[in-house]
Amino acid sequence: MITVVGSLNMDLIIRVPRFPMPGEAIHGEDLQTACGGKGANQAYAVARMGHTACMIGCVGTDAFGEAMLGNLRAVGVDTRAVIQRAGSASGTAMILVHDTTGQNEIVVASGANRTLTAADVRAVTDRLAQSDAVIAQLETSLPATEAAMAIARQAGRLSVLNPAPFAPLDDALLQLCDYLIPNENEASRLADVEVRDLESAAAAAQALRARGARNVLVTLGAGGVWVEAEAWRGHVPAFPVAAVDTVAAGDTFIGAFVTRLVEGAAVYEAVQFGCAAAAIAVTRPGAQPSIPSREEVESFLRARGA
């Protein structure tokens, strides 16, 4: 079982021909809604890869909350540890997606996600301690994330932190991370090293390992992933595809990567599998609707001789 402690958001998506300037109004396409949130996306990806997934988080007692829970349950995610918090609105994300590049700009209203406490996480310690891996991000409260990583470490379980969105992190938290997986922007800010190429990605990853993270993967979008791990270091290239929407690409990568890792795959193989899953995801619109099945990922890899 892989347990994800994190956010659940309803995504409100508008495709635009370009991103607006400050003070400017532009026309976009019709509003679309899709279930998302970094935590929920990662749990959804784990389930789509065929592994048992458990979600820990908070939603409101509203229609968005019910829809998000239903969407996770539909692919087999265990949502019994998701709290429906009375008086709080479910998290929402406003997402602008560029028509041509598929790049996005996102503003998140955290809502109930921010009400998840360390005490809530500790209340399900047994579930976390029985997991093969625990994944967390930074869209819920920092104390909740810290509690999840601490429980995983104390139980000898694989601990994975996706430090998104960026927040300053103490070395004490990094020292609880078996795998720290930032993107280039988060790595730049956490390591105080501007990531602009593979050499600087390696420098940032090394700096984060020096602060205590056991292994670091810096995701570089179309540039692939730089791996700075105990077992292997180097670059894993992305698979070239025509991107339509990059929302949830990183979450898809993490869910697929961790799944293969707990199944016993070597780091390079697990990263390549994650890259394949993310490559498929960016060719489809939406967050969870874009996440491929394991069969699709394996077929994609076979077609490319990987």
What does each of the following model-derived ranges do?
Residues V75-G87:
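A glycine-rich helix N-cap at a beta->alpha junction
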Residues Y44, T92-L96, E105, G224-V227:
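Short beta-strand scaffold segments in enzyme catalytic cores
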Residues D120-V124, A133-A203, A222-V225:
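Conserved beta-alpha-beta core of the PfkB/ribokinase-like small-molecule kinase fold
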Residues A167-A172, L198-A306:
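Conserved phosphate-binding/catalytic region of the ribokinase-like
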Residues M1-C58, A63-V77, A242-V244:
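Glycine-rich phosphate/adenosyl-contacting loop at the front of the ribokinase-like
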Residues C58, V82-R85, I95-A133, L138:
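Conserved phosphate-binding/catalytic loop of the ribokinase/pfkB sugar-kinase fold
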